Amino acid sequence: STVQTINREEHLKQFSKDYFDYIIIDETHRAGAKTYQRILDHFSPKFILGMTATPERTDGYDIFSLFNHNIAYEIRLQKAMKEDLLCPFHYFGVTDIKVNGEVLESASDFNHLVSEERINKIDEKIKFYGTDDNTLRGLIFCSKVDECKAISEALNKIGYKTRALSGDDSEEERANAINDIESDDPNKKIDYIITVNIFNEGIDIPRLNQVIMVRPTQSAIIFVQQLGRGLRKAERKEYLTVIDFIGNYQNNYLIPIALYGDTSYNKDTIRKLMASGSSLIPGSSTINFDKISKARIFESIDSSNLKLKKDLVQDYQLLKFKTGRIPSMVDFLDYGSRDPSLYVEYSKSYYNFVADQEEEYESKLNPSQSKLLEFFSMHINDGMRVEESIILERLIQQGFISYDDVKAIIRKNYGYEANDKTILSAVNGLNLKFVTEREGGNGKTLSINEKYGLRIVSESENKITIDSMLKDALTSTIFTKFLKDNTEYALKTFGNKFSADKFQDGFILYQKYSRKDVFRILNWEQNPNPQTVGGYFRSKDESNIAIFINYHKEEDISASTDYKDSFIDNTTFTWMTKSNRTLEAPEVRVIREYNGLRIPLFIKKSNAEGKDFYYMGEMEPITNSFRQKNMSSGDPVVQIDFNLNKPVEESLYNYITHDN
């Protein structure tokens, strides 16, 4: 019996509430509809089971509550592929046609979407990429019903057998089309079903061996649904071919999110996934992009705002439904949901965001407590350095911790030796003496500690204790709850990215750091003014010079700052000092002497990536490489070559050095 049939009043009356011991709901994400609700309200079974590939509804209905938030088993696309439950796929992201020199956009004119040029390109790619057995059994997904019909007519004219289907077609017509695409009878068989979204779910076409997408990706969930139509295993089916025509679409960043299954919406993570190619895809499946389509996706990642309030609220609500409670920052990590740091970036603290969503938390903290949570969230518990969070966790638990205990915890959990200088720097950070703010209108820069007169922790004789302001704040159970969660989030975040073989005295190779992060990890007493840092800055004690590189500079950059900084190869880097420097300049002298000097290298591909830089490793100057040069402006500059202490990993090296 179908849902539509049993939903009728005359049919429901035939069954008592306890007639069924077990009820199984397939495609249970639809259970929020009135038809399903009427059935579920009528029956009281001993056991109810829901099955769906996409439980994350975006209409605000809590599907999980129907099952008391009890998730018996969950398997996502990547895990199903790893377990060999699906057939492999080969994905090809190809550039859509250009109209008047411009790649198609979401709002492109209908005539361009069905132009002869576009039909010819679809035909070309069908023949080029083909299928596993050279027999076409494909689905083509379009963005509009009239586009489906026009593309179907055009492909039929050049020799294909296709059928356009929409919501107006009956179940019988859809079933006939499925039978025909699976048929071996040459008189019945069709090559393609062309549709918008009616085949996103609930259909079974095991022999389907090609999926073509000629529409922008509006949702990672829908992308996976459409991809999944062809992943069913079948006898003699070797793989699925996926051809995705990528235009200049705003949401192109959703493609790697869908393909790789990462829903953190962390831009750096998405870039790394794109750079990884097929290496992170289970089994024999592959992912390929042509040069232009790959550039379009990177541009979309750079330009998209991944912390819009509507998106943050949506993912917050989905996780709340899933867990059956207000989610914590750690829940976002444990469930593989949106990166909780995005909530901090948006609201200054996760508490602020929750208080905006939940009446029970509104105005529960006084301004001092709320401000302190903001400071910890933005400047301490960010997962960039672990020492502060270890100290804070123990202070919350017992009010004190010794230097030796900090060292023992780090030795046990991470296998490296912390030193007194770093622990003292962490205490300085916890007291918010490192981070600065401007005071009033005079522009004077003060540490946050000095500006607000904070007393957070005390340090004496290698013992750290809780001070008055933090002690008072911890009398609030809500403050304590959110600070504990924030601290646990920081410890987990650091632990998730920590790798002993990539850890180099505070930094983790190929992780991203802001300038503020860098100077904090280098144990500077106070964060320097960014305007004075520029491309590098040396410490007062001349123990380190951190170098920051914007690898692909803007075309309109001034001649006096157009520095020729670049990789010679993956182990050698050539670098220029600031202009108006000679071989006798102080920083050149310090680098030439290289007496215990630390020179960490930080690079971002371009300014479009934002303010953070990849840590590329430690550098050592090549003795005979110091040379006096002149900028194109005529200003003197010194160029120096360096050896990196480790070769840069291939995927990141290629990503940074290749211009989009």
Question: Where are each of the predicted segments found?
Answer:
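Conserved helix/coil segment N-terminal to the catalytic DExD/H
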Residues: 1-22, 33-38
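Post-DEXD/H (motif II) to motif III coupling segment of the RecA-like Helicase ATP-binding lobe
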Residues: 30-90
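Conserved interdomain linker/interface between the two RecA-like ATPase lobes of SF2 helicase motors
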Residues: 71-142
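Long, largely alpha-helical accessory region at the distal end of helicase-like NTP-driven motors
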Residues: 127, 144, 258-391, 398-402, ...
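A short beta-strand element within the Helicase C-terminal
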Residues: 192-216, 222-225, 229, 240-244
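Acidic, glycine-rich low-complexity segments with interspersed aromatic residues
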Residues: 371-378, 384-395, 506-612
